[in-house]
């Protein structure tokens, strides 16, 4: 019985791998045929537990998404957007880190009709809005916040929130946008010296750092939010 089960699982995984190739190619006609035969194909997953719906989003297939949305009587009738992969990532994590902001907006707008939770953590405590911050996806961060993402949630490993990740990964434009567009208090959770040590160790030049005190090696940015002090490093290492 166990052997039969393993064989069935392997066949399932091979089938999903084949479907993935056709999604990547953009073969919507073939996908439509499979969907009409078995609508639940969108929730089937590969060995990494990444569902077909996730792969559609990963490959940025807006035409596939619009086809799927037309097949449901209401959002979520068939498509499960809360499924997790082997690392605990949901489809929102994958959408958040993509360059194509319109794809995220399309899915948020569709599932937002019934109310959605976009603060789901993966197994490291990383939320979709943190993923977007790590990649410097400014529009995605703001869209997720608009739909209820909490930028002050911390991850499990470093204790960083969205703001911390934006600073830590050196995305100056995102930091400036958060200063301007997000009016609630945001807080830093790691000491300044740790950030500096990290950048020195990995030979990276930080664009933005945070300090709680003014110093002659720092210059305030004009976009400063009164909730916190955003500064640009001026010494020879930070240039």
From Swiss-Prot:
UniProt short sequence motif Nuclear localization signal, positions renumbered to this chain: 81-87, 203-214
Protein's job: IkB-like protein that inhibits the binding of NF-kappa-B to DNA, thereby downregulating pro-inflammatory cytokine production. Forms a heterodimer with the NF-kappa-B subunit RELA/p65 and prevents the activation of the NF-kappa-B transcription factor. Inhibits calcineurin function, which is required for the induction of nuclear factor of activated T cells (NFAT)-dependent immune response genes. Prevents the binding of substrates to calcineurin without affecting the phosphatase activity.
Superkingdom classification of source: Viruses
Post-translational modification: The protein exists in a 28 kDa and a 32 kDa form, probably due to post-translational modifications which are neither phosphorylation, nor sumoylation.
Motif (FLCV motif): 228-231
Record has Methyltransferase as a keyword: no
Keyword Repressor in annotation: no
Domain notes: The C-terminal region contains the docking motifs PxIxITxC and FLCV, which are required and sufficient for binding to host calcineurin.
Sequence motif PxIxITxC motif, residues: 206-213
Organism of origin: African swine fever virus (isolate Pig/Kenya/KEN-50/1950) (ASFV)
ANK repeat segments: 48-80, 87-118, 124-153, 158-187
Known partners and oligomeric status: Interacts with host PPIA. Interacts with host PPP3CA/Calcineurin. Interacts with host RELA/p65; interaction of the 32 kDa form with host RELA results in the formation of a stable complex with NF-kappa-B. Interacts with host PPP3R1. Interacts with host EP300; this interaction inhibits the association of host EP300 with host RELA, JUN and NFATC2.
Induction cue: Expressed in the early phase of the viral replicative cycle.
GO CC entries: host cell cytoplasm; host cell nucleus
Family: Belongs to the asfivirus A238L family.
Compartment list: Host nucleus; Host cytoplasm
GO biological process, one term: symbiont-mediated suppression of host NF-kappaB cascade
Name of the protein described by the UniProt record: IkB-like protein
């Amino acid at each position: 019985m166990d052997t039969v089960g393993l064989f069935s699982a392997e066949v399932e995984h091979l089938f999903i791998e084949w479907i993935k190739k056709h999604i990547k190619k953009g073969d919507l006609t073939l996908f439509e045929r499979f969907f009409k035969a078995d609508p639940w194909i969108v929730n089937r997953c590969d060995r990494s537990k990444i569902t077909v719906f996730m792969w559609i989003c990963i490959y940025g297939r807006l035409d596939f998404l619009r086809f799927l949305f037309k097949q449901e009587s209401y959002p979520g009738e068939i498509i499960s957007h809360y499924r997790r992969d082997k690392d605990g990532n949901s489809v929102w994590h994958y959408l958040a880190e993509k360059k194509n902001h319109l794809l995220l907006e399309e899915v948020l707008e569709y599932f937002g009709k019934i109310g959605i939770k976009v603060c789901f953590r993966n197994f490291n405590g990383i939320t979709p809005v943190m993923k977007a911050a790590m990649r410097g996806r400014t529009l995605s961060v703001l869209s997720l916040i608009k739909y209820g993402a909490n930028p002050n949630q911390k991850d499990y490993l470093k204790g960083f929130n969205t703001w911390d990740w934006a600073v830590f990964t050196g995305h100056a434009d995102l930091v400036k946008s958060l200063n301007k567009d997000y009016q609630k208090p945001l807080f830093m959770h790691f000491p300044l010296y740790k950030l500096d040590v990290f950048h020195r160790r990995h030979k990276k030049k930080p664009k933005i750092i945070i300090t709680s005190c003014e110093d002659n090696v720092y210059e305030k940015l004009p976009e400063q939010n009164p909730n916190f002090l955003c500064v640009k490093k001026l010494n020879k290492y930070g240039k």
